[in-house]
Amino acid sequence: MMDYPLTVPHLLDRAACYFPDVEVVGRRPDRSVARSSYAEVCRRARQLAGGLARLGVGRGDRVATLGWNHARHLEAYFGVPLMGGVLHTLNPRLSAEDLAYVVNHAGDSVLLVDDVLLPVLERLRNQVSLKHVIVWANGTSVPAGMIDYEELVAAERGEFAGSQLEEQ
């Protein structure tokens, strides 16, 4: 029997504590290799959590992702639950009509999106009501009215304590 809950924040902290220098390797949407460590993933996930909280995202708010499998997506997997949000991954292969239905049905209020998938977002933008769109830009400029992920993360110190979540 564990004497503490196995929540996402706990798993993140444990990885950063016991394996801080273990390399985390992934691919960016442009297929280039990205390398970091568990300590770096933990810090950036906490920065994302702080940035989302600063935007007014709160416990139970749904944060959707429309992106490919890469390091920033991993940061969202940890950062969103860390601040008490609900991570909702969207399938980029769905039609715009189906994506709009899923976003609306789930009640997503924030969307994290790969810049290469902005054309997909454009096709459903008028069908969904999102408070914030945060772009995982890869050397491209972020459209007006949207937030650059790296700027959001860089504005935080990475000390977000996290939301105390109950396992049961």
Residue ranges of model-derived segments:
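Active-site-adjacent beta-strand anchor residues
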Residues: 5, 66, 111-114
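A short N-terminal helical cap/helix-turn-helix that marks the beginning
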Residues: 3-25, 43
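Short acidic-aromatic active-site loops that bind/stabilize oxyanions
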Residues: 1, 38, 42, 163-166
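Acyl-group handling in specialized metabolite and lipid biosynthesis
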Residues: 1-2, 33
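Conserved AMP-binding/adenylate-forming core of the ANL superfamily
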Residues: 24-70, 74-78, 95-100, 148-151
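Solvent-exposed, charged/polar functional surfaces in cytosolic regulatory/catalytic domains
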Residues: 14, 18, 44-51, 155, ...
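Structural core segment of the AMP-binding/adenylate-forming
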Residues: 11-13, 54-55, 82-151, 161-163
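Conserved pre-ATP/AMP-binding loop-to-beta segment of ANL
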Residues: 20-22, 156-168
